[in-house]
Amino acid sequence: MKNFKYILLTTIFTFIGISCEQEMTELSPFPSEGYSSPSGSSGSANFAKFATIGGSYTAGMMDGALHNFGQGHSVAKLIANQLAYAGGASTFYQPDINSANGYIGPGPDGIPGTSDDQGRTYLTQSASTGAIGIDFAPGDLMSVLTPYGGDKTALNNFAFPNSVLAMYLTPFAGGPNVPANPAYNPFFARFDASGATVSPLGQFIGSGASFFMTWLGHSDFLGYAARGGDQAQVPIPDAATLGGYFQSALGGMLAANPVWKGVVGTVPDLLAAPYFQFIAATVAKPTEIIPMANDATLAQLQGLAAGFNALNTSLAGLGYITAQEAGMRTLSWSVGANSILVEDETLTDLGPLWDALVGLGLLDAGTRAALDPFKMARQAFDGEILPLSAQVVIGVPVHPSMPTAVYGVTVPLPDQYFLTGAELYEFEVARQTYNAAVAGAVAAYGGGRVAIADFNGYFESLAGTSPFTNNNVVVTYDFAPPTGMWSTDGIHPNARGYALVANKFIAAINDKFGASVPSAMVGSYTGAALPVTVN
């Protein structure tokens, strides 16, 4: 994979000052784009009515939230725009969110619906220092809680974010909103036309469409990886279960409507998104991160490492841990960049062993206390992943009164901020297994009516060719303005990126059905927005 890892947020934007003269002093409406006016044909397909179902990409989530601009440039909407040139309808109804900023969650007060609620993210640039940052626009909780005001029975796009595949198969996705109903999704409930009696998939099937796009399972994998593989928050996707769900969904769709045709998508190589590639595993600089740090601090860390490593060697010699694990846990600090200290739940918990050594008089209590943060710790290996969310934790003291106890250096990052090599392997096996189930379902039930847009390796291929041009416009695989194809959350594309994704689906449609649907003109869509100037 092309190396597009970056250490600090400022690194990716060093060119802003020389390539972008524009300054923004407040949040402004996004510009509109012009669309091409080509012509095409539908081949053996019928695009008269197009319906879609899927997760956050299909719904148009962008900058961490579902908002007007993102929804207006969803993958579903951009495909519909192009189908209109090949016999498709000129209208495509989505459950308008009616919010410029959308809603991510409560702000620092932790209370939803208050003045510090957080909406979409955007880039900022300090007027005094030029430093680049990311901030939140004011959140709009009511955009999620307010029912869609249009005709719910006329919708074309049944996609909704913050979902898992099982939600699409149950009417309980529409309610009730009670703790005993984990299937409830407020983004679906606001446009549920059935009063929680028909599943999202059932309503999608009942739309009477002649052509469909289905992208299911994507969000299950995205949610797990985004939370660092912390199974206490999101379990690793069970590929066998998800594959069964998809087979049931596709079989039901095709049986219920024996004439419609469509396209399905596989789960992309999500770990190639900037959210998972932005922070290098070797960013810890103790003498810069720890306040008042100096050569003496580094010497203390090196002394701690020497003692820790020697202790592990002894434990391996006594058979309490393997020599391989002792090697994995070797700590090393030096001047400059060092590997991040992380928590690895697969390691042996050394706490009880150290307690036993204290009881035997072989380890003093002070040393035991100093070692406690390292009982399941090691330093990250090359190729392991720190999600972008770790940026706000690395180098932060555990408590203000403990300035030298900082995450990533002297205290391991919690599991939610790190994907181990084992977790990455499990993730990829599950993703590939699920994608094989998608292909198997199409082979078993498709009957020549279903195309597959295979996104395996797609993001990595874009990263490997970045920068590239479209319509004489430069496109880069990042969220750096003005050329980037990713939104500021690093995990959802922006309008330009969604156009690239839409074109992948369009290519599959053309290939399967002998159609000539024109591709979206990627260069005509907005890339990453310029930063807002702040004091």
Region annotations inferred by a language model:
Residues M1-I18:
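Sec-dependent bacterial lipoprotein signal peptides
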Residues T14-N46, A515-N535:
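Bacterial Sec-dependent N-terminal signal peptides
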Residues F50, V75, I79, S210, ...:
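Histidine-centered active-site loop/cap adjacent to the catalytic His
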Residues I205-S207, Y245-V264, A430-D454:
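A structural motif corresponding to the C-terminal end of an alpha-helix
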Residues A273-R449, A453-T483, R496:
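Acidic, Ser/Thr/Gly/Pro-rich low-complexity segments that form flexible
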